[in-house]
Amino acid sequence: IIPALVNGKYDVIMAGMSVTEERKKTISFSKAYMTEPARFFTLNSSPLSTFTSAKNLNLDDDSSATSGTISALNNAMKGMNIGVTVATIHEDFANKYLDSNLKVYPTQDEMNLDLAAGRIDAMLCDVGTAEAFMETSGGSNVVTFGPNVFGGLLGEGVGAGIRQGDADLKAMFDKAIADAAADGTISKISMQWFGKDLAP
């Protein structure tokens, strides 16, 4: 999707793309219009369902508490199969921090189905994405565990991807997002469609 933007196939990426330092080497981003942590999900019958940890894991914090939480996650998931979707910040996180067996999926739907069928032990994804699946009959046995994961390589939130050099277009998006955040529009839309406020 990024190469097609760079090559002029379209002007903006509006696909829930996280703003990361790595991506900013290739494209520009608008201000973030949404923020959402990542979490781990498993079946309610899994021993992982009772795993407890700190509420939040901020990857911008390099304290011993952060490394301790990551270590505890790795100990709990040792030898297990963990799913992530391809070319996402979740795959980046798993490659950097997890010692588990990683299974990479082309789509979230395929990963959801494998988790529900017990073909993987857990998955890592955005909270809202998994919660939508949990509200279906296929995901009714799925539960979350572990901390809210954010910061660091998980990025600064979700923004519109824009070609580097398209300063006028970026300015238009930045203003529209700032106005929509200030007047409550982003919060209202977020509550309507996600059931929670994901405004930055």
Positions of predicted regions on the chain:
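Short helix-initiation/N-cap motifs at beta->coil->alpha
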Residues: I1-P3, S67-T69, K103-A117, G128
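Ligand-binding clefts/hinges and TM-proximal coupling segments of bilobed small-molecule sensing domains
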Residues: S53-G79, I89-Y97, D174-P200
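Acidic, polar ligand-binding/catalytic clefts
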Residues: I1-A72, G146-L153
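Periplasmic-binding protein-like
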Residues: T35-T42, V127, E131-K175, K196-P200
